[in-house]
Amino acid sequence: MNESPAQPLTETIPVFTTQNLDIYYGSHRAVRDVSLTIPKNKITAFIGPSGCGKSTILRCFNRLNDLIESFRLEGKVLYHSQDLYSPNIDVTAVRKYIGMVFQKPNPFPKTIFDNVVYGARVNGYKGNLEELAEDSLRRAALWDEVKDKLKASGFSLSGGQQQRLCIARAIAMQPEVLLMDEPCSALDPISTLKVEELMNELKENYTIIIVTHNMQQATRVADYTAFYNAEATDKGNKVGYLVEFDRTGKVFGDPQEQETKDYVSGRFG
């Protein structure tokens, strides 16, 4: 294993930087020594087998792991060079600027309109909520499908529409970053294609990090790819680590590490 995985060229502004990141749950180290830089207005995919820490690392970027009592972190997670885990950080503000889209669509038991503007309303948004809802739904490529039924329940939509509604809800908070944890795993192929097309449109205005088990999806949407692997510990747990991080074409077409070659060729995973 290469202890200093290849880093992509930093021709764009870095949004996140991790430095020697270790993640623990109680005494168990779940992730070890991850150092990487996430570039602005690009799509970065996290790939790797189950248990390698992809989602755990993703949740560090908006501090969702804080909700797990046994969680602790060593090393640094920097957002525009600011330490996200500094005692002075406003975690609520972090989650405003760094939105999250989960594996399964999770609309609220509210109307389509109220789903979109919920976060903005709760946070005291002073602008026009109707304009915000329309703009967010347009950005999420959903407006034309729901503009005549904004008072209908979010649950009335198809699975793919619900996921785009959740993306619209995240966009309405006017974030800089969208974190997506396997956003297409519960969707059919047609809905998946729509979400992938949407991601490519959104990267003009947002930095996107996506966790995916689907390597074909990573090759279709990601500008950069980070491959993680895991190894067993003496106690029978797994610890994840970063193997390789580079442009997606390089990771899949000319990987530098044998582990990466084995994974992308389907030899394990």
Swiss-Prot record:
One of its GO terms (cellular component) is plasma membrane. The keyword DNA-binding does not apply. It is a peripheral membrane protein. CDD domains: ABC_PstB_phosphate_transporter. GO terms for biological process: phosphate ion transmembrane transport. Part of the ABC transporter complex PstSACB involved in phosphate import. Responsible for energy coupling to the transport system. Coiled coil: none annotated. It is found in: Cell inner membrane. Its EC number is 7.3.2.1. Residues 16-255 form the ABC transporter domain. This is Phosphate import ATP-binding protein PstB 1. Belongs to the ABC transporter superfamily. Phosphate importer (TC 3.A.1.7) family. ATP binds at G48, P49, S50, G51, C52, G53, K54, S55. SUPFAM superfamilies: P-loop containing nucleoside triphosphate hydrolases. Keywords: ATP-binding, Cell inner membrane, Cell membrane, Membrane, Nucleotide-binding, Phosphate transport, Translocase, Transport. It comes from Synechocystis sp. (strain ATCC 27184 / PCC 6803 / Kazusa). It catalyses: phosphate(out) + ATP + H2O = ADP + 2 phosphate(in) + H(+).
